[in-house]
Each structure stands twice: as structure tokens, then as C-alpha cells.
Swiss-Prot record:
A motif ('HIGH' region) lies at residues 10-18. GO terms for cellular component: cytosol. CDD domains: TrpRS_core. Keywords: Aminoacyl-tRNA synthetase, ATP-binding, Cytoplasm, Ligase, Nucleotide-binding, Protein biosynthesis. The gene is trpS1. This is Tryptophan--tRNA ligase 1.
Length: 336
């Protein structure tokens, strides 16, 4: 059976972009067709300045939202990255086959490091090595497929390169993974800045629809979405990005095609109204289930505890094999 691994980083409240770009497919498709693992990658949240209490709070919220979005612990494994030591263990070993040049060529590193310097901050080493930890997340589980947005495909390519390089140098140890992404709404854009991804860490709150936004807040944000000065509704991502973003969101909510949907509207207002209502109705069961889970923290704790145990049992043999392959002496009670 195909093994799938993907994760969410608790650096902000999860958004419509997270849901349409990843979480909905995880629940509707990936957990049913594969041996799937979904992880709250909290270690990745430490690469920049952060509030420890907020990271803990958002980690729990992210786990609850994964379950609220439809992930079923009976069908897949849901856990928190830092609860499974094998991620950190494997990350160091992979750093020993990665190169400094590879890390500095990562697009996200360049962008995030530049923003940090503009703010007058120092760039943490963990930001540079972030892609290696992500590779460890993937390779520890013998992952075949990694559902990601297009902004993360370079990191999956690095994981592939490190797996191949390690296998060639030290013997076959890792499955070589591949990135996958849905055709529609793989990258939902900011409603106020349609050239930018709708990111949970952004400061432009009016342009971001959060999964836990109240329905009236969702409606207000969509109705105020940036479009252009035109009047006709056409699907043109290159020239009319804001309008195209609304059509893509509506298409993702209704299983339609953006270009075909455009033909059914003669005004931006009507399109915005229908898009807002489609988003509200799609997110309604997620919000309601999240409220139920928030009232039962013991259930979420149990899911995460059992998920970590399952994940650890899957990852440990691969990580132990990697340690032996690269030349590390195993503990006496684990010697072969």
C-alpha cells in the first residue's frame, strides 16, 4: 500500500488555503487509499522568533482541526512531530550527506532569511537546515507520496536527492518519495494581495480566511476581496489574479471549473456573494466539529498519544538502519 506523509506547521491559525490545498484531500482521498500519516510539525515552528506558549496552543489547535476536517484515527495516523524522537535523530544523519550549498539555494530559506534581516533579526541555523528536518520527516516513514503545495516541492526534491545519495553511498535504506498536489486550489491566494499565497503567518488578516472565522467574518472578507477595475467576469490568472482567485476558490468549493463558472456571472458582486456562501457552508461542519473536540481535550490527547506510538514504531526501524548504514555503533541490546 502507498504510504503518504504530510504535515502542518503551527506558526499561525490554519486557513482556507490549508484546507482547500491539503486538508480536505487528506480526509477525502489520502487516508482512504493509503497508509497515511499526518503530522503537526511543531519543531519547524522554532526556526524563527516565537512565543513558546503560542506554539503549544497552536499545535493543539492544529491537531484538533485536522480531526475536525475529517481525519479518522482509525484510518490514518495523526501525531505531533516532537513526540517522535526519530525525526530529530534522522535529521542529523541526513545533515551529514547534505551540503551547505544545497541549503542556501532553497528558495524559502532565501526569502525568510531576507525578511528576518530586514527586521533586524539574526538568521537561526535551524532556518538553514529546516529542509533537512523536513526530509527526515518524510524519509523516516518510507514515504511514497508527499501531498504539498507548489511552494514546498523544492523541499521534497531535496528529500529525494538525499535519499538517493544516502542509498548510493551506504546501501539502500530509504524509499525515494515524490511530491503530489491537487489540480484545483493547490495554492489559494491572499484575498487582499492576490499575488501572494494565503499564508497562516501573514500579517494581512483581512485577506486571510481562517478556518475558525465566524461566518459573518468570512462573508466580509470575501466581499471585500481585491479584484480589478474591469466589469466582465472572465478567468484570466495572469492578467486578473484577484478575480481568478475567487473563481478558483468557488470551483474548489463546488467541484466546478473556474473558466466555466465565470460564464455564469455578469457582476463581481454576485460572484463574491456566491463564493462567500460556498466557503461558509464548506467550513461550517469543520467549525462545529472543532467546537466539540475543544470541549473534549482528553480525546485529542489520546489520539495524539496513540498516533505518536504508531509513528514511532514505523520510523524506528528505518532510522536504526540508517544509523548502522552510516557507521554508528548500535546500543548493545540492539546489536545485530
Amino acid at each position: 500500500m502507498t504510504r503518504v506523509f504530510s504535515g502542518v506547521k503551527p506558526t499561525g491559525h490554519l486557513t482556507l488555503g490549508n484546507y482547500l490545498g491539503a486538508m480536505r484531500r487528506w480526509a477525502a482521498v489520502d487516508q482512504h487509499r493509503s497508509d497515511a500519516l499526518f503530522c503537526v510539525v511543531d519543531l519547524h515552528a522554532l526556526t524563527v522568533d516565537h512565543d513558546p506558549a503560542r506554539v503549544r496552543r497552536l499545535s493543539r489547535q492544529a491537531a484538533s482541526l485536522l480531526l475536525a476536517a475529517g481525519l479518522d484515527p482509525e484510518l490514518c495516523t495523526v501525531f505531533v512531530q516532537s513526540h517522535v524522537d526519530e525525526h530529530a535523530r534522522l535529521s542529523y544523519v541526513l545533515e551529514c550527506v547534505a551540503t551547505d550549498g544545497e541549503m542556501r539555494r532553497m528558495i524559502q530559506y532565501k526569502e525568510k532569511a531576507a525578511r528576518e534581516r530586514v527586521r533586524g533579526g539574526s538568521v537561526r541555523l535551524s532556518l538553514l537546515t529546516y529542509p533537512v528536518l523536513m526530509a527526515a520527516d518524510i524519509l523516516a516513514y518510507g514515504t511514497d507520496e508527499v501531498p504539498v503545495g507548489e511552494d514546498q516541492t523544492q523541499h521534497v526534491e531535496l528529500a529525494r536527492d538525499l535519499a538517493v545519495r544516502f542509498n548510493q553511498r551506504y546501501g539502500h535504506t530509504f524509499v525515494v518519495p515524490r511530491a503530489t498536489s491537487p489540480a484545483v486550489a493547490a495554492r489559494v491566494m491572499n484575498l487582499q494581495e492576490p499575488a501572494s499565497k494565503m499564508g497562516k503567518s501573514d500579517d494581512t488578516g483581512p485577506g486571510i480566511v481562517y478556518l475558525l472565522d465566524e461566518p459573518d467574518v468570512v462573508r466580509k472578507k470575501v466581499m471585500r476581496a481585491v479584484t480589478d477595475s474591469g466589469r466582465d467576469v472572465v478567468y484570466d490568472p495572469e492578467e486578473r489574479a484577484g478575480l481568478a482567485n475567487l473563481l478558483e476558490i468557488l470551483a474548489a468549493c463546488t467541484d466546478g471549473e473556474p473558466a466555466e463558472l465565470a460564464g455564469g456571472y455578469d457582476s463581481y458582486g454576485a460572484l463574491k456573494k456566491d463564493t462567500a456562501e460556498a466557503v461558509v457552508e464548506m467550513l461550517r461542519p469543520v467549525r462545529e466539529r472543532h467546537m466539540e473536540l475543544s470541549a473534549d481535550p482528553g480525546y485529542v490527547d489520546g489520539v495524539l498519544r496513540e498516533g505518536a506510538e504508531k509513528a514511532r514504531a514505523m520510523a524506528r526501524p528505518t532510522v536504526d538502519d540508517a544509523y548502522r548504514a552510516i557507521g554508528l555503533l548500535p546500543p548493545v541490546n540492539a546489536a545485530r
